[in-house]
Structures are given as structure tokens and as C-alpha cells.
């Protein structure tokens, strides 16, 4: 079984982990709804992309009746 010959120092361990940090999420404010959304993604509130309606909202039959 493989066993390390020398103890890995805290410095070496942290240098190895330096690339594991998460980056910030880039969000923009939707011009039509004012909600936050990811750039180049469909707005989850009204289903628009680039000021065009691309996804129709589902209508609940219970609310209509």
C-alpha cells in the first residue's frame, strides 16, 4: 500500500488547493422584470430571452375555473 514518505506541509497543501476556490457568480438585472438572472439565460419569471417571449407560461386550470 502506498504511504507518503514525508509529511506534506501546510504550505504545500494550501498551494495545491489554491486552484479549488469558487468564483463569483455573474448576475445581471433583467430590464423587463427587474429580477436577477444569469446572463445569456432565459428569464425564469416571464420566459423571455433577448426581449422575446420564448417560453409560454403554464396556466393552472384550477385558477381559471
From Swiss-Prot:
A GO CC annotation given for this chain: large ribosomal subunit
Keywords, alphabetical: Ribonucleoprotein, Ribosomal protein
Tree of life domain: Bacteria
UniProt KW Zinc-finger keyword: no
Gene Ontology biological process terms from the UniProt entry: translation
HAMAP family per the UniProt record, alphabetical: Ribosomal_bL32
Family of the protein in this entry: Belongs to the bacterial ribosomal protein bL32 family.
Disulfides per UniProt: none
Protein name (record): Large ribosomal subunit protein bL32
PANTHER family: 50S RIBOSOMAL PROTEIN L32, LARGE RIBOSOMAL SUBUNIT PROTEIN BL32
Species of provenance: Rickettsia typhi (strain ATCC VR-144 / Wilmington)
Annotated GO MF terms: structural constituent of ribosome
Amino acid at each position: 500500500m502506498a504511504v507518503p514518505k514525508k509529511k506534506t506541509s501546510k504550505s504545500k497543501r494550501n498551494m495545491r488547493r489554491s486552484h479549488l476556490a469558487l468564483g463569483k457568480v455573474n448576475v445581471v438585472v433583467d430590464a423587463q422584470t427587474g429580477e436577477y438572472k444569469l446572463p445569456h439565460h432565459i428569464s425564469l419569471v416571464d420566459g423571455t430571452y433577448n426581449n422575446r417571449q420564448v417560453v409560454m407560461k403554464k396556466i393552472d386550470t384550477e385558477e381559471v375555473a
